[in-house]
Amino acid sequence: MTNAEKLTLAKHACHIRMGVIEGTHSAKCGHPGGSLDIAEVLSYLYFVDMNIDPKEPKKPDRDRFVLSKGHAAPALYATLAERGFFPVEDLKTLRKIGSYLQGHPNMNETPGVDMSTGSLGQGVSAACGMALGAKISAKPVNVYTILGDGEVEEGECWEAFMFAAHYKLSNLCVMLDRNHLQIDGTTETVMNSAPLEEKLKAFNFNVLTINGHDYDQIEAAVKAFHAENDKPTCIILDTVKGTGVSFMTNSVDWHGKGPNDEEYAVAMQELNAAYAALEQEDK
C-alpha cells in the first residue's frame, strides 16, 4: 500500500470518527469508545476490500459485513455515510424517534446494514450462516464480522467458532476488537478470556494478531484471509478504545455515554486538527 493510499484511508477514518462524535453528541447517548477504535479497519474494508455498491445495497453477490458488537453502531453508520449509502447529515438523527439510525443496527431500516445485531454473540452466529449459505450456493461472497473482546465472554461465540471450523468456512473473517475494556472494567478483571490466539487456533481457526490501527498490517492480514482455503480466519485487532479523542482514549468511562457540548467541542477540535494535518501531509 502506498503512502498516498494510506493517507486517503486515514482521512476516511478521521471522518468516521467525526461521525461517531456527531451522532453520539446529538443523541446524548451511545457508545463512542468502542466505535472510535475500529475506524481504521472499517475504512479499509469499505473503501478497499469489500465488494459492495452503495447504489445497489442489496445486490446478491455482495460481500457481507456483520457488526456483532452492535453497540458500536455509530462507527458503522459513519462508515456507511462516508461510503455514500446515505447522507452524512443523517448521522445527527442517531437514536431519535423515527430515525433509521437506531442504537443498534437494523437491517430492515438502514441501507447497507446486512444483519440486525445487539444481543452479544448473535452477530457472529448470523455471519456463520451467511458464510455457509454462500458456500452452499457457490457464490464468491466473503463475510466479515467484528466482535468485541468483552463479547467473547458469551458462550454463543464459541459455539459459532466451532460451527465455522466444522464447516470449513474459509470465506468467513472474524475480526476481534481487542481493546481490553468493557462496560464494567478491564476484560482481564471481569472475565479473562486470554489466551485468545491459542484458544482460536485450538478451534481450528487461521489466527493473526495485528495492530488494528496500522493499515499495512490490516492489509496483510486481510490478504492472508483471502489466501486461506480450508478454515475460517480470525484477525485479532490490538486496538486502543477511544482512539482519536484524547479524553476518551483507553477510558472505560466512554464505553456507553455521549459527549456533552463542551466535550463535543474539544473532540471535534482534535479531530479537525488531525484531519488538517493529514491534508498538509498529502500536499
Tell me what each language-model feature is.
Residues Y77-T79, N106, E156-W158, D184-E188, ...:
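Short acidic, glycine/serine/threonine-rich loops at helix termini
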Residues M1-I16:
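N-terminal hydrophobic or amphipathic helices/low-complexity stretches enriched
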Residues V20-G23, S35-H166:
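Cofactor-binding active-site loop characterized by glycine-rich and histidine/acidic residues
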Residues H71-A72, L76, N179-H180, D214, ...:
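Glycine-rich beta-alpha junction loops
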